[in-house]
Amino acid sequence: MTIENKIKDLINLRGQYDGVHCAIYPNKKCIVNGREILMLIIDSIDRVEAYSVDMNDENPYFAYLVDYTNEELEYIYDCFK
């Protein structure tokens, strides 16, 4: 199973569903590339997005899992599991 699928399964298992999106929140601080990831979301077309804020200017960012390396995804998974 790929790390992307492990993350998606984790969201489906533990996520909070609002009727459109399913979201999960980290169990510990998760910082990747100077941005703190605040939640992972499965969007309306079944893609996983990471919602984060920049540590310097606090601007919000959305990124898809493909925007991260496998090493970063393993770290993200560890923060959210």
Show where each model-derived region lies.
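Residue-level detector of alpha-helical secondary structure
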Residues: E4-I11, I42, N70, E74-Y77, ...
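Acidic, low-complexity, intrinsically disordered interaction modules
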Residues: Y17-I76
